[in-house]
Amino acid sequence: MPTVPKSQIETSTDSYVARYPWAVEKAIEQQSIFWPAEELGVEEDEQDFRTNLNPAELHGIITAQSILTQYELMIGGEEFWGGKIAKLFPRPEIQRLCAVISNVELNSHAPFYNIGNEVMGNATDDFYTQWKADPILAERIEFIHKVAASDDALEVTAAVAFLEGAVLFSAFGFFKGFNSRGFNFIPHFVSGIDGSAKDENLHSMCSAMLFQQCKKERAEKGNHTKEDEVRLSNTIQLMAHVIALHEKRINSLLFEVPGNRVITLEELNHFTEDRINIVLARLGQEPMFNTPSGVVSGWFYDQLSTVKVPDFFAATQLQYRRNWARHQLTFRKELANEL
């Protein structure tokens, strides 16, 4: 006997009427800022990657890059946006949102990281699977598989909110140091990190919105009791605790070689704590860490909600929106005759 859905948002429909207009708005927002990985000119950073970064900095970049592509493939693939979440919420507007987010992960972010690896000469089969030989990185992937296996929509969306809003941001914080404090290393690559950060922040918020909507509807139907809320809160707090421990261990791998000039382990761990607190708040939970936002947070938060004014040194090519309307385009015959 099939399981009865616990809420409207978990109930399939043959209609195309959007009951959740916010999901349509977020899908349109994400589509409007889609950026092709090939546009950024990461190849121009080859000199930095090969000669201008010191061994400590290059080690950190290579270590982070060794697992980032795997993250993107899982988050955008069947495990989450490209499969699981669309099945948990079988409504057309939610599936539209899932499709556009999956496309961003698989058709923008993952190729972008691959271009960086190609420039460094690391885009090989061995490189993309070397995380399996590292017990810390392998444990992280095992954790992602575990939460992806859950059939509880609330647990899955909470996990995705953390993965996109905290886990990925640890790597972003590390990379951002190369273009802060007066440093201008790998500027084209960091431009992609800026774009990824905006995208992933949006995805984390979308997952949290799905979480909150689902929980609200379940409660209204009597399918989310006080006891359920206590269990859910405990699950989320444990998830946050495990992620914090994992991230700090992974962060330490980035600094195994001493001498990084652009960011410290303490600063990165502080940023990880800040991001975990932010996601907890999105999920209606109390903060886990009693620390204010640190220096790395300051590098990001102005950019997540505003558009930078480009200058001579700003390599970012992501400060645009495709907001033209086809029906408003006109054909100027006099210009055509000049060709």
PLM features: what roles do these ranges have?
Residues 1-339:
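Non-heme di-metal
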